[in-house]
Amino acid sequence: MKTKTGRILTVALIFQLLAFSACAAWLVYDAKVDRSGWAEKGGVRYYRDFHAKPVTGWLDIDGQRYFFLEGGIPATGWLEQDGVTRYFGSDGVMLTGWQTIGGKTYCFGDDGGMLTGWQQLDGIPCYLPDGILATGWQEIDGKRYYFGDDGKMRTGFTNIGGDIYYLDEGGQPLTGDAFIGENRYHFSDEGVMHTGWLTSEDGLRYYQADGTMVTAWQEIGGKRYYFGENGAAATGWYQEGEYIYYFLSDGSAAVGPTEIDGATHYFTPKGMEVILVNAAHPIPDYYTADPVIVEDWHRVDRRCYEPLMQMLSDCADAGIEYIFNCGYRTLQEQTDILEKRTREHMEEFDLDFDEARKMALETVAVPGTSEHQMGLAVDIVGEEANAWLGEHCWEYGFILRYTEEKAEITGITNEPWHFRYVGREISMDMKDSGLCLEEYLGAV
């Protein structure tokens, strides 16, 4: 019995030894196997090291950076460490560069740290005051900037809510008067570009729809204005070349009959003053002729001398003879003509003085109401000359003053020899209009 029992114990011992040996062999083999990688336990994803232990802290995996919490669980969402704020995706990957999180844009450095303050986006400045990409108006260090919906700082002309601003190279809106290129603009204290009329210290200014300040002659709302180099609209009397203008308090050029200091002045539709002289409009006291000799003893006002000489020269070159019958007359000379004509009618028609004077006034103007006293009217006699001048006088700044068609308006019978100087711009306009001077100046 002892022998049998001993054999059984021996066999059992051998099996135990073999089992222990196999287990030891297995343990030695397992210690050499890399058990690192992703694993899941209880529905929770974690990462284990070589020995299958959960890792903690920073770890780079396949070129991506992670931070593992206790238990090897990767951090997700926002994480602040040592004053540095980072963001990890739902897969635990640390984000870098520009990222949109919860509908807001952030920028993270290469170390994952959230960036703040001034940064560059596609080479254009942007601003992240608290890490979030700023848009719209922002005040930074006491200065205003505007960032588009894409977060990029705007420069140049920019439409913001229907208003136009100009943001300089530094992104700040211009205010007040400013030159941009060769053009002048005006911006409000808030930076809004001004258009239309603006009252300034030196007068009225006008800015077009594109914001540029106008200068020189402009037609605005059917009225003419003149703006100086500084943009201020002219007011009062203004002379340019041979023409004189008068600008009203609103800056517009006077047109038609206009009362100025108790006297009526007449202006063309373009604002040039033309002195209207007829039986109802004597030569104004302020007018002074500047007579110069033109042919023999005849004289004309200096203002029409050169165009008159050119007109007569061209008439002669056309092979047409003419007689220069009359130019400038003094008040006394006009008085003498009227007196002489009255006496002639008294003798020729056996009339009393009143009857003869009335008859004389049909062809002779009352002293002070003759255009000849201005020195701007000439009488050129000759049928061919009258025909040529009637066709070409407009080109030299003269008008055929009295025609048969307009006799009821002018009060003077047809005088094909009488030409009045008004300047070429006016004469050509009148030719196209077909109006006599009274009609053209709105005096009827």
Predicted regions and their residues:
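N-terminal secretory signal peptides that target proteins for export/translocation
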Residues: M1-K2
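Extracellular adhesion/carbohydrate-binding repeat motifs centered on closely spaced tryptophans
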Residues: T5-E273, E306, E391
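Extracytoplasmic cell-surface/polysaccharide-interacting catalytic and binding patches
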Residues: L17, D261-G262, T268-V444
